[in-house]
Amino acid sequence: KRTDYPGKEIAIKTQYAWDQQFNSTINVVFGNEWYAGNLSYHLKSRPVWEGMIQRDKLDELKDYMCLDNICVGSR
């Protein structure tokens, strides 16, 4: 069930991995609207969902990383 989805835990792991690699703030997420939106909700910076993952969108970012089926980044 979606009520059992571990969104908070995924956000904590994502933020930790991000902080190990970058000093910037996560301000965008890409991927499936439900999964990426859930991640956005649980991240402190509340990044904006900008649609499905596309290479050209990622190339415009200063920093980015992809975990499973979601990418997060910083402009």
Give the predicted meaning of each segment:
Residues 2-75:
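Luminal/periplasmic acceptor-recognition loop/helix of membrane-associated glycosyltransferases
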